[in-house]
Swiss-Prot record:
Keyword tRNA processing: no
Name this polypeptide is given: Small ribosomal subunit protein uS14
Subunit structure: Part of the 30S ribosomal subunit. Contacts proteins S3 and S10.
Annotated function: Binds 16S rRNA, required for the assembly of 30S particles and may also be responsible for determining the conformation of the 16S rRNA at the A site.
Length: 101
């Protein structure tokens, strides 16, 4: 099990990403657009740097909802492979069953 502080940190990052998403996207569009004057683009870069570091989506880490485990995470279920297996064996995930051939 992951420490509660690490889970809380991920939740905080998710909130920051959602809060600054539109602002970050608009600044990145300005930075990429070659038709905009260089000075204005440079100002956009400086504004982007002033945003909180944790507001960047790449700082987030996918974690299991139950355990907080960062590795072997299955996006479709939001769980780690072990918790998916346990839930499948109990029949809690509709349409998912153990393979046999």
């Amino acid at each position: 099990m992951t420490k509660e502080s690490i889970k809380a940190r991920e939740i905080k990052r998710l909130k920051l990403v959602n809060k600054y998403y539109t602002q970050r996207i608009s600044l990145k569009k300005i930075i990429i657009d070659q038709r905009i004057p260089n000075e204005e683009r440079w100002n956009a870069v400086l504004k982007l740097q002033t945003l909180p570091r944790d507001s960047s989506p790449s700082r987030r880490r996918n974690r299991c909802r139950h355990t907080g485990r960062p590795h072997a995470f299955l996006r479709k279920f939001g769980l780690s492979r072990m918790k998916v297996r346990e839930a499948a064996m109990r029949g809690e995930i509709p349409g998912l069953r153990k393979a046999s051939w």
